[in-house]
A protein has these predicted regions:
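Conserved N-terminal segment of class I S-adenosyl-L-methionine
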Residues: 1-84, 88, 102-105, 175-195, ...
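A charged, aromatic-enriched C-terminal amphipathic alpha-helix characteristic of glycosyltransferases
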Residues: 360, 509-547
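Conserved catalytic-core segment of nucleotide-activated headgroup transferases in glycan assembly
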Residues: 232-254, 359-360, 368-439
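S-adenosyl-L-methionine-dependent methyltransferase catalytic module, highlighting the catalytic core
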Residues: 4-5, 9-10, 35, 77, ...
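Donor nucleotide-sugar binding/catalytic pocket of nucleotide-sugar-dependent glycosyltransferases
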Residues: 70-71, 175, 330-362
């Protein structure tokens, strides 16, 4: 007989992203074994995490993940938390276990800061499985789940909305958790005649009965609203995740912000009545139809931002089209100060958001002191690594099975490695890329000294360091980030590379020391939690200055003020 996992050992994946990523103080009521605290530490280790848990054994298990944990019954008394001090108050599967959840909501709402948010996950008493079991005569309590024998209270969507309002809060949004879509479809199909006989519209009933739970967000005052829609490139090498998906998810963790990512270059349907921003990911805007496209985007009323994180000289058509890619938008966002200086030639409104990670993973390397694996997984780096291959092969010959190599995407480099201790994987998803990297101890990051490379960011170092890899890198780009001998090694020539690699093989503890230092640096300064507020502040400032920015746009490109002939797609 297997022992069931401790209550609360896993974080609710639908609740976690609805907590503001840059929250400074969070109270987790009924934290159980601390799953939410553990997961949150990987997203924002700088948050002050406070928990309430009445069960002594669970509290002891959760304690390492929180700054404070109070062993008390939330219905018997409030935790020692100052009124107005919390950015987030979390009830994850807790309210249904309380005798008087309405009183608890009223009592704890005062702990929220003026812009703080209550996040709660509650079961839906209208879930179709309730009706199904009652109709079939099989309703009984269970140890866990919707029919948990410790559930004392039940909520409908309308009932929970009323409870939040009566607690003095403003319901902001609610997300349904649907775990068995085929089940509700089959159930509604079977009982549709009865529903219709009762005057209940089957589709409406299905919407109410499908969610197993609801995740609610409510605030003390109505938040300012903002809609951000991004039009993206075809996913390649994780750039979409790092530059678009994860930053927008960070924005959407704030109440009142709606974020959506759509592939391609069509005209997005912006939510009505909400100030909007359209982000174009690296669109060249060189086609003859580009002015019409930009006019159609402008006609939505949204502010237009170009997201560009590479040297535009790599695409000559940008210059040939008069740099419309940057002149024809309200603002530009990029990843490095060098790129900002370049884009300022064509647009005075440029912001830098360094590449950062949404979460820092738990390390799973350095498990064998007798073997190290070198990771090489960047795109279009064949010319950068080629001069180093003879030196790498020499070290591989000396090291034997003590050194393996993991190569992603670059088949030519893989084939040139003279060792049986090598693995190859084609270009896959960003998750697959990270999984391959996570099993290695050393990352090799070569970059030739070219204009295009000098404009690149240090993302590969950030990703590798987060997984606790020791980086050996070129001075181009990485010399400004890596402290040689402290957070990695900087090498310029093949013989320097071979010397550094031999030293790490001789003393793996040194590789681990530098990898740990690099990981600590990423945790301190290169997580999205550190820049979420700055990005949102810039976006809101653009909205406030839209008239001014729009006038500047039309002064740069007067043709964008003409009537559009573009057909929205």
């Amino acid at each position: 007989m297997t022992t069931p996992p401790a209550y609360g050992i896993r974080a609710n994946p639908d609740l976690l992203p609805r907590i503001p990523l840059d929250a400074r103080a969070i109270l987790d009521v009924g934290c159980g074994a601390g799953g939410l605290g553990a997961a949150w530490r990987r997203r924002n280790p700088h948050t002050r995490l406070i928990a309430v848990e009445p069960d002594a054994a669970l509290a002891a298990e959760a304690e390492p993940h929180y700054d404070e944990i109070h062993r008390l019954d939330i219905e018997a008394g409030s935790p020692p938390v100052a009124e107005g001090s919390l950015d987030a108050l979390v009830f994850g599967d807790v309210l249904e276990h309380l005798r008087d959840p309405w009183a608890v909501l009223r009592g704890t709402a005062r702990l929220l800061a003026p812009d703080g948010v209550l996040v709660a996950c509650v079961p839906n008493v209208e879930h179709w499985s309730f009706a199904a079991r009652l109709l079939m005569g099989g309703w009984r309590y269970e140890e866990t789940g919707l029919f948990d024998r410790t559930h004392l209270r039940w909520f409908t969507r309308d009932g929970m909305h009323q409870a939040l309002v009566e607690a003095g809060l403003v319901p902001v949004d609610v997300a349904p958790r649907i775990v068995d879509a085929p089940g509700i479809e089959d159930f509604v199909r079977r009982i549709s005649p009865a529903l219709q006989a009762l005057g209940v519209e089957p589709a409406g009933y299905a919407r109410r009965a499908a969610p197993l739970q609801y995740v609610w967000r409510a605030t003390r005052r109505r938040p300012a609203r903002l809609a951000v829609v991004a039009r993206t490139l075809r996913p390649v090498g994780g750039i979409n995740e790092v530059r678009i998906h994860e930053p927008l998810a960070a924005l959407a963790s704030r109440p009142g912000v709606v974020a959506r990512v759509e592939p391609g270059a069509g005209i997005p349907q912006m939510p009505p009545g909400i100030p909007g921003i359209i982000v174009l990911q690296r669109q060249l805007l060189n086609a003859p139809s580009a002015p019409d496209y930009l006019r159609a985007l402008r006609a939505t009323g949204a502010l237009i931002i170009q997201e560009f994180d590479d040297d535009p000289a790599h695409w000559p058509v940008i210059e040939e089209s008069g740099h419309l890619a940057f002149r024809g938008v309200h603002a530009v966002q990029t990843s490095t100060p060098a790129l900002r200086e370049l884009f300022l030639r064509w647009n005075p409104e440029v912001a830098v958001f360094p590449n950062a990670l949404a979460t820092v993973p738990e390390p799973r390397n350095f498990t064998s002191p007798d073997r190290l694996t070198l990771f090489f997984g960047a795109l279009n780096r064949e010319g950068d690594i080629a001069p180093f291959l003879p030196a790498l092969n020499a070290v591989l010959a000396e090291a034997g099975e003590r050194l393996a190599v993991q190569v992603l995407h670059d088949r030519a480099t893989f084939d040139a490695l003279e060792t049986p201790h090598k693995r190859f994987a084609p270009l896959g998803s960003y998750a697959e890329y990270q999984a391959a990297m996570a099993g290695c101890e050393i990352a090799f990051l070569p970059l030739r000294d070219t204009r295009f490379n000098r404009m690149k960011s240090d993302l590969k170092f950030v990703e590798a360091a987060a997984h606790r890899l020791c980086c050996i890198a070129s001075p181009v780009v990485y010399g400004a980030t890596i402290r040689d001998g402290e957070t990695g090694r900087i090498v310029q020539a093949p013989d320097e590379f071979a010397h550094a690699l031999r030293a790490l093989l001789a003393t793996p503890a040194e590789a681990l020391r530098m990898a740990e230092a690099a990981r600590a640096e990423v945790i301190a300064s290169r997580l999205l939690a550190r820049q979420a507020a700055a990005r949102l502040s810039w976006y809101r400032s653009l909205i406030e200055r839209r008239a001014e920015l729009d006038a500047a746009l039309l002064a740069r490109v007067p043709v964008l003020g003409a009537a559009t002939t573009h057909t929205p797609r």
